[in-house]
Amino acid sequence: MNNAGKNMMSSSKFYMGYSRWDEVKGGYETWEESVSRVMNMHRQKYASVMTPELESYIAFAEQAYKDKAVLGAQRALQFGGDQLFKHEARMYNCSVSHCDRATFFQECMYLLLCGCGVGFSVQSHHIAKLPQVHKRYEKKVKVFQVPDTIEGWADAFGVLFSSYFADGGSFPEYKGCQVHFDFNKIRPKGALISGGFKAPGPDGLRSALVKCEALLEALVEGTTGAVSVPTITAYDFVMHMSDAVLSGGVRRSATICMFDKDDELMLKAKTGDWFVDNPQRGRSNNSVMLVRDELSREEWANIMKSVKDFGEPGFIFTENKEFCFNPCVEIGMLPVSENGESGFQFCNLTEINGGQCVDVESFMRACKAGAILGTLQAGYSNFKYLSDATRQITEKEALLGVSITGWMNNPDVLFNPENMVKGAEEVKAVNKAVASLLGINQAARTTAVKPSGNASVVLGTASGIHGEHSPKYLRNVQMNVGDEVTRIITKTNPKMVEPSVWSSNGTDVVVSFPVESKEGSIYKSDLMGVKQLDYVKAAQQYWIEHGTNYELCVDPDLRHNVSNTITVDDWDEVEEYIYNNRKWFAGISLLSSMGDRAYAQAPFTEVFTAQQIVDMYGDSSMFASGLIVGAL
């Protein structure tokens, strides 16, 4: 088997997103050097409580990490060291919150700039708590000089919204003022900044502020009093902020917006000509919140018909409308402090390499290492920009999300119920021991299954709980045009690169890596519909449930979940199965069996040989223009 494409992907992902420039040696870090940097950061963080026992745990996890038996937080690889100590939110892959307070938008922008994905609820009972907006005075003008920091960029949005908020928001001195933003302090595009990154320049920020201001003006135009912010407008504010973050090229700006099942504007947010009229909406997944016991069979049938016909809306089953989920829906959270103040809560993720779990012993070793890494990460809660409620929420449950990628590479080991339970219990036990040494809380929930797009690329496994796509396929990866790795690939292999249709600012390209799967792999075609859902249900029952410390959860119904994408072969059968088993599911992405072509530049696109095309469609198929265009 030729693994050149997969190896190129792995190296590209590591050097593009995680390896740091070493000034001393005049080159980029190796894998082992990057891991050492992260683990030494943990040693520095916990120096005051270091004991021989704690060091033995750290050393154990470090070796497993270097062996790629596990991965720690990918944000730690990216930012580990002084950058992460400056902004400890950078430890976490994703965050969630209710959109229900004046500071939400600037805190959201801050987290996106830190590299965190954001899940946010615009359900009516949350949006109703936002301050109302009103017209500003035409002749009252104030200047805000934007500091060249992520706090400064976030503050710019705080100032803009405060100028409209009836209560003055978080910057009451700007209440009712026309705001002139001065970008002179922001370094020009391409200038070197800390961590080996390059400055994005002010254009993306300026554009997002202008677009958000236009939305606010549209709300107050023709009014004499204060008006409420609609759900769709609050959603678009975050989408424009996401575009500004993406222009910086630090990472993908991942978001998910959760809304009410009767919110017609949100239900239609990605219908019609949205791709032309509102391209910023491509930055999010949108999901309707469905309370399991309140969902009728008829309502479910209508939702599934829309999903089948239009691919929208996404949906999330929940026990409580106060619960929130990260963009990939594998972490369930309740981002409210004990005194009722809303804030953010975080996904604290580690990854087990299922491709290396060839027996119970190797699986248990990975479970132990994943738990150690996750517990070390859980202590990073010095959030200087965010509210104290966020710190309280994060420290209270001290969540872990020990995930497995490559389930289908060793299914006999990983899907054995006894092994799943044993592994989950090991994660809980190790977490309890290490948390005690660190002086932090034991985790309320410890196990999850994330989609593992980037992690599977680095480790060379199938993604998450999914099978290999096909024997041969193109793996389409979104990359920023300003990245050095992107420039090298474009120069040496230009036929692999094309402009991204998902980048409204033209800052991204798509690189198509040719991949040949390992012989004997379980492919997507072997895991259609209900068969794949059976695997998801089993992982939820044995891996997730047994990794939950129910007595430590702030709500006994809170659970982590299995992130999954199901290729549907029989829509009626899948509809019935999901409804009858909704207790075991949260979010499910449904893709038609023609899904490769349903979305432009889909992440995976199967490649057929000429003989396979003839076998499937007949001799004359080679002269069919549609197939020829598709093959090209």
Can you name each region flagged by the protein language model?
Residues M1-L632:
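Extended catalytic cores of very large enzyme megasubunits
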